[in-house]
């Protein structure tokens, strides 16, 4: 039974692009959007994973190789989606990287910082720019970014990563203000710790991660998953959130409330 069997399909007829859609939060969102009736374009640089996911989901799913730091590729991604499906209703700018273990400002490397900002912040900017370009004539659309709970609580991530995600939240708020007159909404999902990628398939790592999150998390008896983040993105993308814009939706089980 798929996730949309008990309720109406909330994205029926919509066209969505998901950057970083080949794995992790992106892949979970691609699957959920597809379950809810959307035509989804997976954009990523992980070609094997992206093509495999598209093949598994089948109808109304396609994959396009896209490096979000390259504006020509982002422009081509959006234009190809319009050519194939007639428009873009939802841009989920999810592509991003992390620093690994928390990096101190004393150990920060300029090249690594520029790469981090290039993918996490500039990539989001370019995705939004070209999505807005094709959404504006239709006077509707939805842009969603993956930010982070580190935008609400200090000290849980390295300074470079925090800077990139604060930048995304600032960008989102600026776009919510500017694009409102064009009928375009902009929001963020900001998850707490989520285990994704290769590590998620390793039982030992998974148990260690779940133990850590159970210890430090505020909401007991529950660990945040990529599927949980996908459900938040689904809400923001759906007509149920038709008057929701400028929101940083933090998924942290109340951690930021008790650790201000």
UniProtKB/Swiss-Prot annotation:
Disulfide bonds: none annotated. It comes from the Eukaryota. GO terms for biological process: (+)-camphor biosynthetic process. Keywords: NAD, Oxidoreductase. Gene3D superfamilies: NAD(P)-binding Rossmann-like Domain. It catalyses: (1R,2S,4R)-borneol + NAD(+) = (1R,4R)-camphor + NADH + H(+). Its EC number is 1.1.1.198. NAD(+) binds at residues 20-26, 44, 67-68, 94-96, 161, 165, 196. InterPro entries: NAD(P)-bd_dom_sf, Sc_DH/Rdtase_CS, SDR_fam. The keyword NAD applies. GO terms for molecular function: (+)-borneol dehydrogenase activity. The active site is at 148 (proton donor), 161 (proton acceptor), 165 (proton donor/acceptor). PANTHER family: 3-OXOACYL-(ACYL-CARRIER-PROTEIN) REDUCTASE (AFU_ORTHOLOGUE AFUA_6G11210) (PTHR43180), TROPINONE REDUCTASE-LIKE 2 (PTHR43180:SF37). Belongs to the short-chain dehydrogenases/reductases (SDR) family. Involved in the biosynthesis of monoterpene natural products related to camphor. Catalayzes the oxidation of (+)-borneol to (+)-camphor. Shows absolute selectivity towards (+)-borneol. Catalyzes the oxidation of (+)-isoborneol to (-)-camphor. Shows absolute selectivity towards (+)-isoborneol. This is (+)-borneol dehydrogenase 1. It comes from Salvia officinalis. The gene is BDH1.
